[in-house]
Amino acid sequence: MVIKFLSALILLLVTTAAQAERIRDLTSVQGVRQNSLIGYGLVVGLDGTGDQTTQTPFTTQTLNNMLSQLGITVPTGTNMQLKNVAAVMVTASLPPFGRQGQTIDVVVSSMGNAKSLRGGTLLMTPLKGVDSQVYALAQGNILVGGAGASAGGSSVQVNQLNGGRITNGAVIERELPSQFGVGNTLNLQLNDEDFSMAQQIADTINRVRGYGSATALDARAIQVRVPSGNSSQVRFLADIQNMQVNVTPQDAKVVINSRTGSVVMNREVTLDSCAVAQGNLSVTVNRQANVSQPDTPFGGGQTVVTPQTQIDLRQSGGSLQSVRSSASLNNVVRALNALGATPMDLMSILQSMQSAGCLRAKLEII
């Protein structure tokens, strides 16, 4: 009897520990976020895969402006047909608390009709924020993840060649002003809105830090009273973020990607008993050109092309199949696989099942 009790207790503790997560994994601090940066620049050193300057006048204009700043004057009316230069857009994210001299990654994307950025070098490009202030300078060799080759009118390409990345390719030159440490309250934002989780996090903080330390404002935000000063708030948040809370069950959800046909569901999805009839209707149109020539060579007839079209209509399936009630994800998968439907068919089946009240989950189409 004692052994059974200890076994049940150990199982309960393991289950509880497996469901506990740190507050830092469930929330973020309001105001502590990344900021987007953007810039326009030139990539040089391409192996004949750059912009066709006759079709992208902005590339030539940018090159002339850059040469003018370097003290080189290009005669007016000069038609520079270069193939190793490309105009690009450069994007980056300025991390929270980014300091001067810190390096960040940048993404380089072709703006014109360049065939590839492989082997290119990004020239010094200022990166600006929404306030038009320069916060970083980007420059460096571009790493392109794709590969390609062409010869004799044929080409082979693997992955994308018109975009690349420069690791640590930008240096922060200006710091963003921060309001961290000002005031006596901070808001923790849940990654996913959940009233019960917000209240549970507030209760956990109040249990450790005292009643009134945290208040759940809504399903997304928890207001926390913090001491004043940067160092005090850093220590306070470090303690709070490492607190563990028991994660409540997720909302049952099915996510459908209408472009790729992929269907993803979490473990909370359940099915009620229902009957499904699913049929496939396919239409095949085949058009073939027939050449009709006159039988006699000198009869005055003409050779004409007559199109011949064949249409084939087929319908398969349509039998009524029973779907049993399923309370676990494995049983849901087995029940849906028993229908023998493709992912594209499964999207419409799940929509119909939700309309009939048989799918106990939220259906999200992206």
UniProtKB/Swiss-Prot annotation:
GO terms for cellular component: bacterial-type flagellum basal body, distal rod, P ring; outer membrane-bounded periplasmic space. It holds the Pfam family FlgI. GO terms for molecular function: structural molecule activity. The keyword Methyltransferase does not apply. Keywords: Bacterial flagellum, Periplasm, Signal. InterPro entries: Flag_FlgI. Residues 1-20 form the signal peptide. GO terms for biological process: bacterial-type flagellum-dependent cell motility. It is found in: Periplasm; Bacterial flagellum basal body. Transmembrane segments: none annotated. The basal body constitutes a major portion of the flagellar organelle and consists of four rings (L,P,S, and M) mounted on a central rod. HAMAP family: FlgI. PANTHER family: FLAGELLAR P-RING PERIPLASMIC PROTEIN FLGI, FLAGELLAR P-RING PROTEIN. Assembles around the rod to form the L-ring and probably protects the motor/basal body from shearing forces during rotation. Belongs to the FlgI family. This is Flagellar P-ring protein. It comes from Escherichia coli (strain SE11).
